[in-house]
Amino acid sequence: MAKYNIVISGYYGFHNAGDEAMLLAILQALRKTFDAPSITVISGNPSDTARTFGVKAVPRFGMLPILSSLFRTDLLISGGGSLLQDVTSWKSMIYYLTIIIVGVLFRKQVFLYSQGIGPVRYRIIRIILKHVLNHVDAITVRDSESKGFLQRLGVHRTIYTTADAVLSLD
């Protein structure tokens, strides 16, 4: 049986304890769910991420390695954390949305995992967010405010509210 290929996109490889714990929680869940999955993480420090978590890793701004990984993957996971907000930076929001858009265009399964969504100040970004998220396969958010925001935005996919993935760590 072929290995199940998974790409994880998030704010990984920057030694942020919360984000690294989120990645660990996602990896634990995936390894319980799939038999020996092949996992690639998009990372700010690929060698450190690969060594620490026992995964493949590609550089955060290496477009060719990212595109190649997304082309070969079965599933793209975007999360967790508060990636889809433009208060910190509208550029980071566009970055994460672009990864999701490529996954959708490549016809991959795309899963938003344990996300905190918003706030989104810019109207054009809200429009893009609505259209992109109406094409993903699954959405889980970590709070009712994020769910309400997406519903008011016009995202018609089923949105599940779940605890922050870090709470599931073994």
Per-region residue spans from a language model:
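Active-site anion-handling motifs in enzyme catalytic cores
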Residues: 1-170
